[in-house]
C-alpha cells in the first residue's frame, strides 16, 4: 500500500510518505529545509522501487535537504537491472539520502536492498535489527557500493548495528557519539544527520536550536 500522509507513523506496512517531523511538528524549525521520510516495509517490488525514486524526485523538486528511507525488508522481487537502476538513482541523488533500519529490533534489510547501505549518505539501525545477504555487489556508473570491511561477511551473512558500525559499514556522523543501543527512532535519525558533511561539502542542518525559558539555546 502507498499513501501520502502528514505526521509521523508507526506500524504501517507497505510504503508511506511521511511529512518531516522537523517541519510538521516543531514550529521553531520553520526556517530549516525539510527532511522527508519514506517508510518501506515488505519485499521490494516495482511499486516500492517506483515509490522510492518518486520520493527522491519529490525531495529534489521540493527543496528538501534530505530524504530518510525507513526500511524493513527481507529482499527484492524485481530484476537485477531494476535494483541497479535504484542504486544508481540513490547514488546520483541531488538530495542527501539516509537509511534507517527500523522501527523495531525485528526489522531486517536483507538481499539486494541491503546494497543501498553502500550508496546512501547516512545509514543507521535500531538496536537488534540486522542487515545482510547482499549477494554480489552490483556495478554502477561513476559510483561504487562501499560496505567497508563488512562486505565479505554481508555477502552471505548478516550484521547487527554494533557489528556493522565496527566494520565500517554504517555511515554515521563522526561528530556524534552514538551508543551501542543504536539509533532508536526516526527523530533520532534526523538528529544524527544534523551537521553531517556530504561528499560535495554540504553540511546538513536538520535540527533547530531552541532557547529555554531563560533564553539559553539547548
Regions found by a protein language model. Give the residues of each.
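Hydrophobic secretory-pathway targeting helix
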Residues: 1-26
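Soluble extramembrane regions of membrane proteins in the secretory/endomembrane system
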Residues: 18-218
Amino acid at each position: 500500500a502507498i499513501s501520502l500522509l502528514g505526521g509521523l507513523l508507526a506500524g504501517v506496512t507497505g510504503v508511506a510518505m511521511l511529512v518531516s517531523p522537523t517541519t510538521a511538528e516543531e514550529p521553531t524549525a520553520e526556517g530549516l529545509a525539510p527532511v522527508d521520510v519514506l517508510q518501506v516495509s515488505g519485499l521490494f517490488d516495482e511499486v516500492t522501487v517506483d515509490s522510492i525514486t518518486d520520493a527522491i524526485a519529490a525531495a529534489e523538486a521540493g527543496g528538501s535537504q534530505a530524504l530518510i528511507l525507513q526500511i524493513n525488508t527481507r529482499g527484492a522481487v524485481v530484476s537485477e537491472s531494476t535494483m541497479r537502476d535504484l542504486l544508481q538513482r540513490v547514488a546520483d541523488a541531488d538530495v542527501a539520502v539516509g537509511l534507517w533500519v527500523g522501527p523495531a529490533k525485528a526489522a531486517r534489510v536483507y538481499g539486494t536492498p541491503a546494497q543501498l547501505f553502500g550508496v546512501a549518505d547516512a545509514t543507521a539501525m535500531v538496536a537488534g535489527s540486522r542487515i545482510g545477504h547482499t549477494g554480489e555487489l552490483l556495478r554502477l556508473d561513476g559510483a561504487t557500493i562501499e560496505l567497508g570491511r563488512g562486505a565479505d561477511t554481508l555477502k552471505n551473512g548478516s550484521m547487527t548495528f554494533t557489528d556493522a558500525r565496527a566494520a565500517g559499514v554504517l555511515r554515521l556522523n563522526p561528530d556524534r557519539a552514538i551508543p551501542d543501543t543504536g539509533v532508536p527512532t526516526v527523530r533520532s535519525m534526523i538528529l544524527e544527520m544534523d551537521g553531517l558533511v556530504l561528499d560535495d561539502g554540504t553540511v546538513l542542518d536538520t535540527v533547530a536550536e531552541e532557547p529555554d525559558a531563560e533564553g539559553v539555546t539547548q
